Design a protein with these regions (language model features):
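Secondary-structure capping and boundary motifs in well-ordered enzyme cores
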Residues: 2-3, 22, 29, 103, ...
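Short, hydrophobic/aliphatic alpha-helical segments
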Residues: 2-20, 140-143
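Amphipathic, well-ordered alpha-helical segments in soluble domains
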Residues: 6, 10, 33-40, 75, ...
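Conserved phosphate/anionic-ligand binding catalytic regions in large, soluble enzymes, centered on
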Residues: 16-37, 142-145
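Amphipathic alpha-helix face/heptad-repeat signature
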Residues: 29-33, 61, 68-75, 110, ...
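Transmembrane signal-anchor/signal-peptide helices with a preference for the extracytoplasmic
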Residues: 40-52
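A structural-propensity feature for long, helix-poor, extended segments
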Residues: 50-88
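Amphipathic alpha-helical interface segments
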Residues: 79, 83-145
Length: 145
């Protein structure tokens, strides 16, 4: 599982000739890190008198940020898994008309399936941005940089 690799291992594989991880896995990793930074802002704000009026909301945002960061990490593997059939489809023979038709059919299905994960990831990132936007308003000014 990619999410269990250390950062150096992930970066090394990302920079290699390997088909995965690719842009989707890297995007998921960066989004999870961004959401973790949002959780850090919430943690640094929790319990501060200056932000007492937002305490309940900050705790809720913290919970959402921590959960979403974990969910985003799962997309590192989901992206690789959804790309695998497409990668295999690229390698199908196309010497005969039947092979070409079969490859075209498989490619169409694989492309559609492979696109679902990045779209779902983008939706999760939009959720993350909403949390970060709110934290920029109610979070500690010292933690937001």
């Amino acid at each position: 599982m990619m999410a269990e690799q250390n950062m150096q291992e992930f970066i090394e594989v990302l920079s290699s000739k390997a088909a995965v991880p690719g842009g989707g896995g890297a995007c998921a990793y960066v989004a999870a890190a961004g959401m973790a930074l949002g959780a850090m802002v919430a943690n640094l704000t929790t319990g501060k008198k200056k932000y007492a009026q937002y305490q309940e909301e900050i705790e809720e945002l913290l919970s959402k940020a921590e959960q979403l960061s974990k969910e985003l990490m799962t997309y590192m593997d989901k992206d690789a898994e959804s790309f695998e059939p497409l990668s295999k489809a690229y390698g199908l023979p196309k010497d005969t008309k039947e092979q070409q038709e079969y490859k075209e059919e498989v490619m169409e299905k694989a492309l559609k399936e492979a696109s679902l994960t990045p779209v779902a990831l983008m939706e999760k990132i939009l959720d993350a941005l909403k949390i970060l936007e709110r934290l920029s308003v109610v979070g500690s000014r010292l933690a937001i940089s």
